[in-house]
Each structure stands twice: as structure tokens, then as C-alpha cells.
């Protein structure tokens, strides 16, 4: 009888487990798949910074308003907020210490939308430290035998089609930023190896290949010129240098009265008159 009773309990337990599993699966299946979008944030020590998050969905579903999001800094939850009708929510965070922090945003488990956690970088910088602007194209290895541009980092660092970093670029850039420079990363959204890449995809590619943490500037309709103007208007006037690959990048930085190093060397006659060139990344530090 004891064996029969034990068997009966196990059967009941299995049935209950199956019911719970089906209910959970049904609940998850009823959610609309979505995406969380968060940009890097830049501020001063002991200053408040606004972190803006967007909830996006590809198909029609539940209203985007009222979705609860959780904000974490370096893995510690610091705030929760609800989205408005546009699916946006803003968090104000007081950054105390100089350095870089990991911003993480998670969607609440009870939300009608399912989305993976997303990360960004919070840069807490002092204004006196110089900033180097780096064109992401200069970090991506080009295939000289191919007539087509290299694929963008959209596929992720573990995919065979993902861009390969230039040898020694991460190491040399880390040396530049260890004690002296802060780094702002920019890229061309419309063409080149980083075309159609989002800031999150660029950020993940940089992290996967051990490039130093920095501010990944979001592409705007005004291009690089608008990005530089926005940083200056926010008080970041110590942008003195840049490292890039293309003539367009070099021309724009020279217009902003910045020194610029192009790596590798451009074909003869294409280098702007006041720009410097380096054969490889080992030469870059000597040129700045």
C-alpha cells in the first residue's frame, strides 16, 4: 500500500508540474516580443545624468505605456520606471565616482512584452581630461582583395561573418586611454564596414574584442558634425585629437580644429594637408 500511495503522490506531483509548466509556457507565449534600446550616457562626477530607454515592438500588440522597467548600475538595481505612451522612460541617476559603469535595463516579468536585458555604458568623466575621437572603421580589418565592404558588427562577435579587428588596435588604444585620454567612438551608419549597425551592436563588438570602454556616440541625421557639435555644447571641449580611417572623418575633424591621425596611410594625394598618417596602430601614439 505504501508503494501504491507513493506512486500516486508522484503521479499527482507530475500532473501538477505539467499544469504549471503549461500555464507558464502559455503566459510567455502570450507576450509580444520586443526590444529595449538604451544609449550610452556621459556626465561629470557628482552630477545627475538622464538615462533614456525605449521599448520597441515590431508587431501590433498591447499598449507601450505602463510597462515597468528596472534600471541597474553595475548589477545593482537603482530605480524602476513606467513607460509613457511612446514606450519611453527616463531615469535620473546621480553619478558620484569618476570612471565607467555598466548600465543595465530589464523589463519586468509581469510586463505584456518580452525583451532581453540590454546594456550600455555610463561614462563619468572630468572635463579637464582630453578626449580622443575614434572612427570605428579604423578598428575593423579590411579585406584588400574584396571589392565589397566588410560586413557590419550586426551579426555579433561569435559569428564568422562579424568584422575582424585590426591587429594590435585594441592594445594600442588601451595604452592611449589608460592614463591620458578618454575615448569617444563614432561610426558611419550609411556606408563602410559599420553601415546599418546600431550603437548597441557596435558597443558589443568593441567589448567582445577588448577595446577600452568609452562613450559610443549614437549616429544622428547630422552625421559626425552634429555629434561633435552636441558634445561641445554639453561642455566637452577637450576633444583635441582623432584617429580615423577615411578622408571624410579627417576632413571633419580638421574643420573642428582638431589634430587627426589616419591609419593606415591613405593613397597618395588623398590625405588632407594638415592631417597626419600612420602605417599601422603601433605608429599612432607617436603621431599624437
State what each model feature region is.
Residues 68-79:
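Short amphipathic beta-strand segments in non-cytosolic proteins
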Residues 126-219:
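Conserved, compact domain cores that house catalytic/ligand-binding motifs in diverse enzymes
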Residues 44-63, 69, 140:
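Beta-strand-rich structural segments
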Residues 98-111:
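Short, aromatic- and glycine-rich surface loops/edge beta-strands on solvent-exposed regions
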Residues 112-123:
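Edge beta-strands of extracellular beta-sandwich domains
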Residues 77, 81-95:
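Glycine-centered loop-to-beta-strand initiation motif
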Residues 193-288:
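C-terminal cap/substrate-recognition subdomain and adjoining C-terminal extension
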Residues 29-50, 122-126:
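Beta-strand-rich domain onsets/edges
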Amino acid at each position: 500500500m505504501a508503494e501504491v500511495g507513493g506512486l500516486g503522490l508522484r503521479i499527482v506531483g507530475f500532473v501538477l508540474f505539467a499544469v504549471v509548466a503549461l500555464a507558464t509556457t502559455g503566459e510567455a507565449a502570450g507576450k509580444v516580443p520586443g526590444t529595449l534600446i538604451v544609449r550610452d550616457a556621459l556626465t561629470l562626477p557628482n552630477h545627475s545624468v538622464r538615462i533614456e530607454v525605449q521599448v520597441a515592438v515590431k508587431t501590433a500588440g498591447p499598449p507601450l505605456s505602463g510597462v515597468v522597467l528596472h534600471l541597474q548600475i553595475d548589477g545593482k538595481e537603482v530605480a524602476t520606471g513606467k513607460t509613457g505612451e511612446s514606450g519611453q522612460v527616463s531615469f535620473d541617476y546621480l553619478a558620484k565616482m569618476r570612471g565607467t559603469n555598466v548600465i543595465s535595463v530589464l523589463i519586468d516579468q509581469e510586463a505584456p512584452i518580452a525583451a532581453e536585458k540590454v546594456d550600455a555604458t555610463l561614462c563619468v568623466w572630468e572635463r579637464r581630461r582630453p578626449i580622443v575621437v575614434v572612427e570605428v572603421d579604423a578598428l575593423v580589418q579590411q579585406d584588400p582583395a574584396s571589392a565589397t565592404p566588410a560586413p557590419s558588427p550586426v551579426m555579433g562577435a561569435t559569428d564568422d561573418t562579424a568584422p575582424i579587428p585590426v591587429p594590435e588596435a585594441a592594445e594600442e588604444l588601451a595604452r592611449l586611454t589608460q592614463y591620458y585620454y578618454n575615448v569617444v567612438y563614432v561610426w558611419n551608419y550609411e556606408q563602410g564596414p559599420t553601415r546599418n549597425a546600431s550603437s548597441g551592436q557596435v558597443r558589443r563588438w568593441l567589448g567582445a574584442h577588448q577595446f577600452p570602454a568609452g562613450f559610443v556616440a549614437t549616429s544622428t541625421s547630422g552625421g559626425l558634425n552634429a555629434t561633435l557639435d552636441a558634445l561641445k555644447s554639453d561642455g566637452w571641449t577637450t576633444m583635441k585629437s582623432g584617429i580615423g580611417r577615411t578622408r571624410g572623418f579627417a576632413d571633419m575633424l580638421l574643420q573642428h580644429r582638431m589634430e587627426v591621425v589616419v591609419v593606415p596611410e591613405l593613397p597618395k594625394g588623398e590625405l588632407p594637408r594638415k592631417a597626419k598618417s600612420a602605417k599601422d596602430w603601433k605608429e599612432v601614439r607617436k603621431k599624437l
